[in-house]
Amino acid sequence: MKNIIENEKYKLEIFDDLNPCSPREFDNLGTMVCFHRRYMLGDETELKSSDFSSWEELESYLYKEEDALIAIPVFMYDHSGLWINTTGFSCPWDSGQVGYIYISKEKVRREYSCKRISKKLKKMIREMLCSEVDLYNDYLSGNVYGFTLTDKENAEEIDSSCGFYGTDYIENGIFDYVSSYFT
């Protein structure tokens, strides 16, 4: 995919980032534990699918052994591409649960320098974990972009960058980089 946006002086070309970094390599708040027979998804952990007989058993383990504050189910849709979310998909044939994203109480206390975890903080963390899944979904489904900005008068490249996750160029940050050229 390539989108071109121009004014009298500049040309912005937005293209697919063909070699993006997995957002699970970033400094994430949550840990994503996923099991699938064909795909290596989520974060590397010591846990194995053979250690659990059901998703409920894994969830129980996360709350009891990992002292999870929150454990949110992660679902995958696999049909001519991969998509994940925390709400599930309507197609029963090509979709199902693949794991959980969770955070321990200890990590919350360490990251937020708090002893007591308020309902407000817990709600904010839940939203952040869901956002991590959304970002990973953009990566898995190929919604990562780059751009080049060119001066049309002399064909000189002014700026370029890659690694913008998501299809909304305002939300993903591309227009933050180039907005001064298009005002």
Q: Where in this protein do the model-derived segments appear?
A:
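Acidic interaction surfaces
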Residues: 1-183
